[in-house]
Amino acid sequence: MPVNYATPAADQLFPVAGVRLGVAEAEIRKKNRRDLTLVALDAGCTVAGVFTQNRFCAAPVQLCRNHLAGGHEIRALVINTGIANAGTGEPGRQTAQASCDAVAELLGIKAEQVLPFSTGVILEPLPVERLKAGLPAAKADLKADNWHAAAHAIMTTDTVAKAASRVVTVNGKKISISGVSKGAGMIKPNMATMLGFLATDASIAQGMLDKLVKEAADASFNCITVDGDTSTNDSFVMIASGQSGASFATETDAGWAEVKAAIIAVSVELAQAIVRDGEGATKFITVAVEGGKDSEECRKVGYAIGHSPLVKTAFFASDPNLGRILAAVGYAGINDLDVDGVRVWLDEVLVAEKGGRAAAYKEEDGARVMAQAEITVRVDLGRGAAKASVYTCDFSYDYVKINADYRS
């Protein structure tokens, strides 16, 4: 079960004018499950995205990049689960193109106006004829209040659907923001198997949206790790339909700061939901690193701790074997780090300082914190004012079982 997370009810996920979603059972890999999602966008939407940095990026990722770089007005997204269409070479690229062609014909748009997404098993061909056969049902299901169904339809090893919504009012205009994400394993995004889709009915200039999607990813999806693996298919897409009447052309526009903060908050909620549902996770851990020369070195330390199987298994066992955290700080790649200046806390319990165990630290205090479902590891590098946070989870027996049984 996820750590302190429940899928919002359908009526808690607000429609975004200009964006309609439909789902269908296409039997991409398994029967009797919704595994195909179609998103139709009204004319005038702006769209931006960031994608995996894995060199074996999936065929749909390659096509998405091309369609966005070409400046085409995006009118549709098509998402399948079960098969990732990654590691499939030229046939995979042809399959991704065929998906776009089929959506374009169905909706009366151009193939270049379609963004395809796939998630699931790598190295297996996508049964595109099944996808195409499922599209009419997905089209028939298109509606603005379908975020809840879409959140379920993009799941793979997820145990819960992940979604979030906010409404903000600026300059007298009500602005809706809704999004869904999926992922539970192969999670160490580097936008760089994680997918995130967010839409708002604000009007946002293309250049601002391009910048915002990167900033939001850096504050959210690029701060999470379940197992340290970067998927071939990671994608985060942001849509601005412009139908609320609220328009933002420059970053100095009145109300922009509030809208931007709300969009980033939804992104963080979607990203943290992935960690809370990490495969086999029993604990949610925030690694908050401060006192760095820059945020990049803080993030390095955060990821060193968050990736470490030894640290993560200690959290699962509620075992305050905290030397593992110090070891991770030491190998994080900060070559001129003065270890005597480093301090480490578990929540408010000071664990280490001056190069060793804190004088007042008692193991029973560490064990008490380690037994909690939510824990903050705070590290002060003592060398500057920068800070960054990484979100991770523990490693349990179930992580091994889930991944050992994944294809069965």
Curated annotation (Swiss-Prot):
PANTHER family to which the protein is assigned, alphabetical: ARGININE BIOSYNTHESIS BIFUNCTIONAL PROTEIN ARGJ (PTHR23100), ARGININE BIOSYNTHESIS BIFUNCTIONAL PROTEIN ARGJ, MITOCHONDRIAL (PTHR23100:SF0)
Site (Cleavage): 192-193
Membrane-spanning intervals of the chain: none
Pfam families (alphabetical): ArgJ
Keyword Lyase: no
Residues marked Involved in the stabilization of negative charge on the oxyanion by the formation of the oxyanion hole (site): 119-120
Keywords: Acyltransferase, Amino-acid biosynthesis, Arginine biosynthesis, Autocatalytic cleavage, Cytoplasm, Multifunctional enzyme, Transferase
Assembly: Heterotetramer of two alpha and two beta chains.
Entry's EC annotation: 2.3.1.35, 2.3.1.1
Enzyme kind, highest EC tier: transferase
Protein family: Belongs to the ArgJ family.
Protein location: Cytoplasm
Catalyses which reaction(s): N(2)-acetyl-L-ornithine + L-glutamate = N-acetyl-L-glutamate + L-ornithine; L-glutamate + acetyl-CoA = N-acetyl-L-glutamate + CoA + H(+)
CDD domains hit by this protein: OAT
Protein name: Arginine biosynthesis bifunctional protein ArgJ
NCBIfam families: ArgJ (TIGR00120), PRK05388.1 (NF003802)
Entry's Gene Ontology molecular function annotations: glutamate N-acetyltransferase activity; L-glutamate N-acetyltransferase activity
Role this protein plays: Catalyzes two activities which are involved in the cyclic version of arginine biosynthesis: the synthesis of N-acetylglutamate from glutamate and acetyl-CoA as the acetyl donor, and of ornithine by transacetylation between N(2)-acetylornithine and glutamate.
Pathway given in the UniProt record: Amino-acid biosynthesis; L-arginine biosynthesis; L-ornithine and N-acetyl-L-glutamate from L-glutamate and N(2)-acetyl-L-ornithine (cyclic): step 1/1; Amino-acid biosynthesis; L-arginine biosynthesis; N(2)-acetyl-L-ornithine from L-glutamate: step 1/4
One of the record's GO cellular component terms: cytoplasm
UniProt keyword Acetylation, yes or no: no
Active site location: 193
GO biological process, one term: ornithine biosynthetic process
Binding site for substrate: 156, 182, 193, 279, 403, 408
